[in-house]
Amino acid sequence: MQYAGLMGRFYVIADWVYKFSFANIIWLVFNIPIIFVLFNLLLADEIAVILVLFAMMLWLSPFVFFPSTIALFSVVNQFIKNEEVKLLSDFWGYYRGNYKKSMKIGAICTIFWAILIIDFFYVLELGNVVLTYVFIVLGFFALVYNLHIFSAAVNIDSKVRSLLKQVAIIMFGHPILSMSLGLLSLAFFYLITQWLTFLFPLFFGSILVFLSLLVFIKSYTNLELSRP
């Protein structure tokens, strides 16, 4: 049913709020194992326990976090295209249909992040300020690259190796847009964790995904138009 005037605007806003919040809740439910381990990791104070929980998170990520996050990107991509969405069934369909590809992407990204994080804490322990900042910058670029990978996985139909190469081209082909995404993502994360924590279970994932997709689609479209 379509509504006109003020009622129509209210209906559109309410519909988007419902879609974003429900999609985020579904994503969180699928990530319950990761959330449980992360919660215990934050509470842990013994190095042995921290290492075990960190290893568990790394092991779970390719099998749980990456497939569910790519499914969330797929659903939000439908929002952007104004396609009709059956949230739960579509989410499950994307999760199941892209599971193997998502797992491969997740394995590659998880190994990279594990090496980066371990090296960062090693350098931090050494007290090398210059290298510490180098790793922080590398982490920032890795964050942007990872967000672009998620977006590319639902917009570009290609094998994983080719996908990773195309993402690098898109990212460095439009550095301002890409860096803006990184800064915006960090600002949004700070805002919702420090000031708007009550919105975290409803909008954190879905809004961040929405912003990532908008930037990626803009960058990808510009790149395609610039080709002869």
Set out the residue ranges of the language-model regions.
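Generic alpha-helical transmembrane segments
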Residues: 136-146
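Helix-coil boundary and N-terminal low-complexity module in membrane systems
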Residues: 1-117, 121, 128-131, 145-147, ...
